Amino acid sequence: MAEKESSKKVTTKKPAATHRRRDGCNSITELKDRNGSSLQAIKKYIATNFDVQMDRQLLFIKRALKSGVEKGKLVQTKGKGAECAGGQGTGVGEGKKEKEKAKLLAQREKARKGXXXXXXXXXXXXXXXXXAAKKVKAAPKKAKKPVKKTTEKKEKKKS
């Protein structure tokens, strides 16, 4: 009997899906689609990797994807609603947003301190470039239409 117990297969259980938005983001990063991942691909990934009943959880997954797009966590590359292709937004890695904000603040401080004259020169150069691009073309001259000559018709005399 001890042999029968040891010969039983040990099956590994799929982890239960805990958070729909996080699972959706993880599926998008794991799928690594170049133009974003479709809803069908995301559903398939979640169904294979998590212990979820997709017919019951589909509404929650769609809602999580929509809210992820609204909050900026996901980027919607095509279509509308949740029936679209989506890509990973910069919001998932919050460090990226902080770095961008820090760069902007550093640039603003440099402009305030000593580069005020350089900023004015850059603004003047940008205005000159915009004016050069907006050259107005002269209206093309219209060709004169030939005037029809009117000829008098001779009346025929009846004899």
From Swiss-Prot:
Keyword vocabulary terms for this entry: Chromosome, DNA-binding, Nucleus
Ranges for domain H15: 12-102
One GO CC annotation: nucleus
Transferase in keyword set: no
Taxonomic superkingdom: Eukaryota
Subcellular location: Nucleus; Chromosome
Full protein name: Histone H1
